[in-house]
């Protein structure tokens, strides 16, 4: 994630944000498809059955989570991006509770508090006054969207059992991520 945020902040000066995301996932797909097209073709019926689920995973995990941090990097700081993106576990727990009616337990709450404390400690280098100087921008809203999208991707990936093996499913998710980004790449 750290390298993604650095590229998001620095790379957008040279390449438009959606282009970065589109070419990232298109490259992944193009490099992997020669090795995985046969299993996909053999399971074309499964592909058709799982089409919308795969598209949703590609949209949330590659499309939104791929483009939104790069868009955010145009107007916010890496520190803000890191702080906001670390909220993903909170959204995972809350959305899992809402969508799948999972109970939130004390250990999860303590884990989230410790996680956030650790992140804030690292970001502030132990100087809590740095956190009080955070200035929020429109880029932070884009990052919040990425964090929520990552949470949705994570809980659906965990709870949806595919008939494709993990790597083949990843290739298909990358493909749908590229497809979901393509119309925005054109503009």
Regions found by a protein language model. Give the residues of each.
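Membrane-interface helix termini and inter-helical loops of multi-pass transporters
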Residues: 6-17, 44, 71-74, 78, ...
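Glycine-/small-residue-enriched transmembrane alpha-helix faces in small-molecule transporters
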Residues: 1-22, 132-159, 179-183
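Hydrophobic transmembrane alpha-helices of multi-pass small-molecule transport proteins
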Residues: 32, 104-126, 175, 181
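Residue-level signature of transmembrane alpha-helical cores of multipass secondary-active transporters
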Residues: 53-58, 82, 112, 139-147, ...
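Hydrophobic/aromatic residues within transmembrane alpha-helices
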Residues: 11, 20, 24, 72, ...
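Helix-helix packing/entry segments at the starts of transmembrane helices
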Residues: 21-23, 62, 66, 79-87, ...
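Specific transmembrane alpha-helical segments of multi-pass solute transporters/efflux pumps
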Residues: 1-5, 33-85, 121
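C-terminal transmembrane-helix exit sites in multi-pass transporters
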Residues: 31-40, 88-113
């Amino acid at each position: 994630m750290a390298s993604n945020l650095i590229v998001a902040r620095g790379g957008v000066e040279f390449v438009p944000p959606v282009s970065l995301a589109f070419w990232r996932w298109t490259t992944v797909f193009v490099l992997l498809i020669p090795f995985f097209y046969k299993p996909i073709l053999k399971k074309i019926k499964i592909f058709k059955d799982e089409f919308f689920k795969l598209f949703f995973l590609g949209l949330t995990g590659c499309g939104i989570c791929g483009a939104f941090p790069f868009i955010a990097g145009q107007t916010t700081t890496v520190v803000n991006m890191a702080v906001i993106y670390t909220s993903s576990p909170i959204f995972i727990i809350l959305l899992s509770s809402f969508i799948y009616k999972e109970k939130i337990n004390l250990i999860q709450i303590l884990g989230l508090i410790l996680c956030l404390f650790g992140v804030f400690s690292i970001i502030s280098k132990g100087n809590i006054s740095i956190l009080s100087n955070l200035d929020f921008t429109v880029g932070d809203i884009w990052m919040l969207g990425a964090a929520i999208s990552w949470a949705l991707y994570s809980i659906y990936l965990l709870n949806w059992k595919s008939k494709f093996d993990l790597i083949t499913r990843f290739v298909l998710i990358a493909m749908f991520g590229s497809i979901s980004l393509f119309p925005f790449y054109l503009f």
